[in-house]
Amino acid sequence: MAQVQGIPAPSLVTTNGVPPSLIIRPFHQVGNVVSVRQFSNNAFNHHHGIQAEERFGLGDPDGDGFRSELTTADMTAVTLYQVTLNVPGQVIPSDPQVQQAIQAGQQLFTQVGCGSCHIPTLPLTANNNPGAPSQPGWIYTEPSPYNPTVGPNSPNLTPGPRNYPITAPALMVDLTSDSLPRPRLKVRGGVVWVPAYTDLKLHVMADGPTDPNAEPMDQNQPAGSPGFFAGNQTFITRKLWGLANAGPFGHAGKFTTMRDSINLGHNGEATASRLAFQALTSSQQDEVVEFLKSLQVLPSGTQCLVVNEHGHCLHEADE
């Protein structure tokens, strides 16, 4: 019998005899958002009080005097803007000592066990695209076939939503296309390897409900339910690509430095890796941090994924 681990609770529910979806929800620190479109719908409403028609309905559902605050076309444009942004890369300065530290830190990152959850690369294969079965996995489809369609907080984001009588075909975008902002990932041997440094799984990251890393609410449980107020210690593995531009650090942004995030934010299942990091010499710990600092968002238009501090390509294969 197989055991499923690291999947959020909503993806493990069996309803009326329908087996669990086992859908990975790669967004939000607790892994409860399926797609960029769902995330954008929620964020516009939660942070800005702007309501999308596809989630809240036509007209002026909140009665604030503003109609059609976000149309389906608006949400499609916002989503496509985000998913076609240039991917993060790596900056390796010209200083030989820093180069050596980054190389050593990358090896130590794996040695102490960080890479068991922060998996350096995950594949997009040519024969796995649920949104467009005839297309390879690097063809992005909008809307996502996994977008939620029911529930009080679930926008109806499938083609032809209930608020609109017109059914439009899914939009497809080749995420490796040179027409998109560079740098971009490329197909190598029929696979696009995504260096996101994650396993997209949920892990227990606290040592109990009193651990400062625990949260008082479990956002993977129904709002207002006993489970919701029971608290949460389980979080998705943070993507590390672009990490140097993403501070403050940790799942809740509690830590001002990467070192603090490692030392103070990795309990629970991450304890062994943290202890292994803390057992390194001070200079070795510095090397790990130097490697993490090299994972950066590159300026749009950068021609390759690995550059020096002047933006010059270091790996010819990435050009």
Question: Which functions belong to the PLM regions below?
Answer:
Residues 1-319:
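Periplasmic c-type cytochrome electron-transfer domains
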